């Protein structure tokens, strides 16, 4: 490598010389006085600033082009009407003129003070008609003062100022004509700096190696540090960051993690990867990805009452809080009926007749209906409640109506309602019955998921290793299947089933088969499809039985099975016992028809075509009208692909440990089920298919096949950035489906090839060679 050549020849001196020249050149540079007069503010730093980002832009001597966009890197941003900037002019001086450039449709006020405490109004600048950034000025001032303050007074809430100048003596040419530049949109600046940060981190990984001089390591370490600070500053200035920017942060975190895996896995023996660099980049990318999962900390949902963003996932909680808390009265089918009945009683002037044309979904059939068509059911639903329970329901419904706003509250009656199993309903019923719907309580219950995340990530780090934990965290936060609005952050216990799968795999990794069975069964009874993990966990034992039959031409005895397959038996017995107990308890609590209703609902959801599904069925038949006819016409292809993936998983699991076998079942979730996009979050657990070795520092931590699995998943996260640019949501999810199955195919092939290379499928290779020779 080039760096190794430089180190060996002591070529650091010229690098320091170049760096010193650059620093001196930068230090000597100062922006010119663009005003051509005595600008009292040029180059000054404010003595006080509140609620303003990019404040240095106000006095740097560079203005925006007239008519330019308001949200660029040339402008300082004022958060609201309370934001202000104050400058100390150094002494009491006369002021005869002020010039500044700002967005056209906002009003600003300048104030003056001699002591910095008591300010008097100096000049009010009203909005102008011309669009974009516009110059404003006055030469009619005749005051003295030491402290000058500027603040917006009213406008559209988006306040931007590019440059400010104040004069004791007016220049010969006034208004002035400063140096101008075309600004770059702040969101573009964010994306650029995020890309540069990712590039700097990757460069740091490949520019360092074990044994490199300490000065070189520190110098290289400055690259991601400076780039990271720059990216953070741009995000802070552009806040809130648009969805495209958040998605690029996700892709960047995945790119850094992929580079770390690649650097360590394929490091030349002469220049091994610097372990501290790999660990640092993996850890940083993991934290960034999880932060991106939470939209970089910006609440994603809207509080219609305060007209402010809220972290509470109102759309999800409206469905599940009421369904779970009042399951005795409304079950899976009656929520919208009760919502309309409560609405009519609560809203003055609202009647079923006036709302008769309002659309709603009939949760008993899943077809679109209207309030007029459902009138008889709406009038009857109140009879299911006691008077006390009905008043409680109305209070809870009123909370969601006020928070969502009446228009959205009625509009979202087109959703399909809660579809969790009676097991999850029972857990949520116990939790939600403890409080009346309110934001504080939902914020607290919303912390249950992050606590589960932290526990699960820690368990993965303990059981599988630090690298595995980081890659899982990156894929968890960097995959974009969930998208805005479907992201369950801010909801309550919506990722529990996912974390239980991971905890089950951790238990199996530590040899706690019964505990693993408990967690996998708990996940399965909450969301059904995780039962595939129990099926796939049995595949290695099926291989063993087949091999035993081929070798001995008889079945093994029960004693032999108990001795050689004890972990699997403990897993299955614990899973069966857990499932039976949970189903029995929920049946006693809700009655058996509750399970029947749930089966019907899931069957209906799985049968109806959905634009946001990410599954093999959608890959083959698309999402448009005529979905079923197309699926039937292409059934040979559909069936062949199912066989391909199932057979691939079966071949991949010969002689594999239980934890790998269980996780491999998740590959089949979008193959067997018509899964919605948010359930494809299971991909975050697929890094557990790669087994990180723990041994000497010199030993490779991953096999090439396992490393390929990690790289495939990280590349999937990177590639999803381009799907975010597709605004047609059905097409977006179809492209996401294409990417998913490309990744799953690569993973299955890597697993099978790994088995072939390690001799686990020698019998199959020999059989195929014999057939070919024949």
Predicted regions and their residues:
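Disordered, acidic Ser/Thr/Pro-rich linker "stalks" and the adjacent N-terminal cap
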Residues: 23-95, 103, 114, 124-133, ...
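Short, surface-exposed beta-strand/strand-loop-strand elements in extracellular ectodomains
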Residues: 105-118
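Short beta-strand-plus-loop segments that form exposed binding edges in beta-rich domains
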Residues: 150-157
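Primarily membrane-embedded glycan-assembly and transfer machineries that use lipid-linked glycans
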Residues: 180-506, 510-513, 541-677, 684, ...
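Hydrophobic transmembrane alpha-helices of multi-pass, membrane-embedded glycosylation machinery
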Residues: 520-525, 532-545, 667, 682-691
């Amino acid at each position: 490598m080039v760096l190794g050549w430089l180190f060996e020849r002591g070529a650091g001196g010229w690098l320091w010389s170049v760096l010193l020249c650059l620093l001196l050149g930068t230090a000597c540079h100062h922006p010119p006085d663009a005003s051509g007069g005595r600008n009292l503010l040029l180059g000054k730093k404010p003595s006080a600033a509140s609620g303003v980002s990019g404040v240095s832009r106000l006095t740097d001597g560079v203005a925006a082009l007239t008519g330019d966009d308001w949200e660029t890197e040339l402008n300082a941003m004022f958060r609201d009407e309370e934001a202000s900037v104050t400058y100390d002019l150094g002494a009491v001086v006369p002021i005869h003129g002020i010039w500044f450039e700002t967005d056209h449709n906002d009003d600003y006020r300048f104030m003056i003070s001699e002591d910095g405490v008591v300010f008097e109004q100096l000049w009010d600048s009203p909005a102008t008609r011309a669009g974009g950034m516009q110059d404003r000025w006055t030469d009619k001032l005749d005051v003295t003062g030491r402290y000058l303050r500027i603040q917006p007074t009213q406008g559209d809430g988006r306040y931007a100022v590019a440059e400010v100048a104040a004069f004791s003596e007016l220049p010969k040419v006034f208004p002035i004509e400063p140096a101008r530049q075309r600004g770059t949109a702040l969101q573009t600046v964010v994306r650029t700096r995020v890309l540069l940060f990712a590039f700097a981190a990757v460069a740091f990984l490949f520019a360092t190696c074990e044994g490199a001089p300490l000065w070189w390591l520190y110098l290289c370490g400055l690259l991601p540090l400076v780039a990271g600070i720059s990216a953070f500053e741009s995000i802070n200035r552009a806040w809130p960051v648009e969805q495209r920017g958040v998605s690029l942060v996700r892709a960047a975190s995945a790119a850094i993690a992929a580079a770390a895996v690649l650097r360590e896995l394929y490091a030349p023996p002469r220049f091994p990867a610097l372990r501290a660099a790999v660990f640092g980049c993996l850890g940083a990318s993991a934290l960034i990805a999880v932060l991106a999962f939470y939209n970089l900390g910006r609440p994603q949902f809207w509080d219609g009452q305060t007209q402010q963003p809220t972290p509470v996932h109102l759309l999800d909680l409206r469905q599940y809080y009421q369904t779970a808390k009042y399951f005795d009265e409304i079950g899976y089918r009656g929520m919208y009926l009760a919502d309309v009945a409560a609405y009519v009683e609560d809203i003055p002037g609202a009647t079923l007749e006036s709302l008769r044309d309002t659309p709603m979904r009939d949760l008993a059939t899943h077809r679109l209906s209207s309030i007029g068509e459902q009138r008889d059911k709406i009038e009857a639903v109140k009879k299911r409640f006691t008077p006390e329970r009905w008043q409680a329901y109305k209070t809870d419904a009123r909370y969601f109506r006020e928070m969502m706003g009446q228009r959205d509250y009625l509009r979202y009656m087109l959703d399909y309602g809660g579809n969790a199993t009676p097991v999850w309903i029972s857990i949520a019923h116990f939790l939600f019955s403890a409080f009346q719907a309110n934001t504080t309580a939902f914020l607290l219950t919303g912390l249950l998921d992050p606590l589960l995340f932290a526990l699960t990530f820690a368990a993965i780090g303990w059981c599988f290793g630090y690298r595995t934990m980081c890659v899982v965290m990156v894929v968890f936060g960097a995959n974009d299947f969930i998208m805005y609005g479907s992201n369950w952050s801010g909801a309550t216990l919506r990722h529990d089933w996912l974390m239980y799968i991971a905890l089950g795999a951790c238990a199996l990794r530590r040899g706690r088969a019964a505990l693993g069975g408990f967690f996998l069964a708990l996940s399965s009874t909450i969301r059904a499809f995780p039962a595939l993990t129990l099926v796939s966990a049995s595949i290695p034992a099926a291989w063993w039985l087949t091999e035993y039959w081929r070798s001995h031409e008889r079945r093994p005895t029960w004693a032999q099975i108990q001795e050689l397959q004890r972990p699997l038996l403990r897993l299955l017995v614990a899973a069966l016992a857990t499932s039976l107990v949970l189903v029995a308890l929920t049946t006693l609590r809700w009655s058996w028809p509750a399970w029947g209703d749930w089966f019907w609902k899931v069957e209906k959801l799985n049968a109806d075509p959905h634009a946001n599904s990410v599954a093999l069925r959608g890959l083959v038949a698309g999402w448009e009208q005529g979905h079923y006819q197309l699926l039937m016409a292409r059934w040979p292809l559909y069936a062949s692909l199912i066989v391909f993936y199932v057979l691939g998983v079966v071949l991949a699991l010969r002689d594999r440990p239980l934890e790998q076998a269980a996780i491999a079942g998740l590959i089949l979730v979008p193959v067997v089920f018509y899964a919605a996009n948010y359930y494809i979050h299971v991909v975050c657990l697929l890094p557990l298919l790669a087994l990180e070795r723990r041994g000497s520092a010199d030993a490779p931590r991953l096999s090439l096949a396992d490393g390929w699995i990690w790289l495939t998943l990280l590349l999937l996260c990177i590639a999803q950035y381009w799907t975010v640019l597709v605004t047609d949501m059905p097409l977006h999810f179809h492209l996401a489906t294409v990417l998913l199955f490309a990744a799953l195919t690569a993973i299955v092939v890597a697993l099978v090839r790994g088995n072939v290379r390690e001799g686990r499928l020698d019998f199959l290779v020999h059989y195929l060679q014999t057939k070919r020779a024949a």
